[in-house]
Amino acid sequence: MKVKELIAMLNERDPEAIVLISGYETLGGTEVAEADLLIDMQSICLEQADNLTGNRKVVSSGGEDSVWLGWKDDYRTKVFLEDAQIPDQDE
């Protein structure tokens, strides 16, 4: 989804509504998180989508401009953001 597509979808919603993202490790649960991070990144499309790993991979360079929406208190956020910024970590 492009930013302009997300903006169009959000423009159809109550501007006072809270933006939620799926809670992780909550299989079948109703727990969610309030999104509070928006980070510029680059990503590439994966050849095969997987319902556990997604359909894109963050890369440090050479990808398409992307925006990551997250929650700062997720226990994996810090490591994810660090890994996404280290060039030699790309596979």
What are the functions of these language-model segments?
Residues 2-12:
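DNA replication sliding-clamp ring fold and its partner-interaction surfaces
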